[in-house]
Amino acid sequence: MRITGGELKSRVIPANFANHVRPSTDRVRESLFNSIDHQKGIHECRVLDLFSGSGIIALEFLSRGAVEVVSIDKDKKNILHQKEIKNSWGLKSWNIAMGDAINAQKTMEKFNLSTAPFDFIFADPPYDMPNIQGLVSVLMPLLAEKGWLIIEHKPQLVLDRKSTRLNS
């Protein structure tokens, strides 16, 4: 697995994260970040990465100029893996916390991390997670006014956009 763009482009991520993690492919990440770069840009943005797994999404945001990334995952092996990369690469603007992504605000408060609005919230919950709409409702207060909420989910899932300010 490698970083697809930005300052850290082509750096390889060791694959010593938990077995149940399913990192986004290089092609998917490259498409996602090309779209973000084209429509909004990342430079100086704050990012919340939930269900962060391997940490690859956080690293892609940092590589492209995010000023701060907060990653939350409940798996200890994933957290240790992310902290190992953070320390060996000297990534001071990457904050990593072990906790439940659904209670992200409480987790950030517990670790004394800023809960100021995020420009991007990326969530990659398990595909069988019930109540994705509930997750959206919990995350909306953490999102900046013109922020992007990006959730990976089953193709057949339809979110209720009336109860949020979601566009697409």
Residue ranges and their predicted role:
Residues 1-165:
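Class I S-adenosyl-L-methionine-dependent methyltransferase catalytic core
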